[in-house]
Amino acid sequence: VHTNIHSLRERHIELWDQFKSGWIGISIDAYREENDYIRYGSRWDLLEKNLLLTKKLGSHWSQWITSSVMVFNSCTMHRLINWFNEFVRNNNLKDLKWRMDPVTNPNLMRIEHVPMHLREEAIEKLKPLVGTLQDKMSNEMISILMKTLRSVEKPTEGSFEELIEYTRVLDIKRKQNVLKVFPHLKEVFDA
């Protein structure tokens, strides 16, 4: 099962736990208002509440949070990882892991649109988190994230302009402002 868990109910957990095994991947891309921006319609309070339901799944279930790392959240993943670390420990969610996947398609969301000096600052904020998570896989993911942030691949031509236009249209339709949520990206969106 892969879900954003907004419609997750206890009855789902009770049913799923009857299976011999299974997996649940939960999409959380950023911390609080950043996640609500990226996953429009998301509500952080409901996400946290429903995440606690996974505690009722037996250890025969693999559980993880998956973060899609992109332009918007590439510099603030430390916020999400800090929250994750605290949340799983405070709520005894010992079976919940964290993983990430870089967004490479569509090209307009690639992290390479964020200037390297901003990504290097993000790496510095991630370094103290290596080794602090409760499982080996999650800790390895932080190292992979830092390596990913150093990418010098070139996005396809025109994809930066697509990013700017896409974000402008989203902000108009949603009555939002990308820079209110991600002020550190001023250099990207005010270019």
PLM region descriptions:
Residues 19, 50-63, 87, 129-137:
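A structural motif corresponding to the C-terminal end of an alpha-helix
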Residues 71-88:
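Catalytic cores of alpha/beta
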Residues 69-75, 92-126, 139-140, 144-147:
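Flexible glycine/acidic-rich beta-alpha junction loops that bind and position SAM and/or redox cofactors
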Residues 29, 47-51, 116-122:
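Enzymes that process phosphate groups on RNA ends and nucleotide/triphosphate substrates
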Residues 1-10, 16-49, 61-71, 93-110:
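Core AdoMet radical
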Residues 123, 127-191:
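Radical SAM enzyme core and accessory elements
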Residues 40-43, 79-84, 115:
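Short secondary-structure boundary/capping segments
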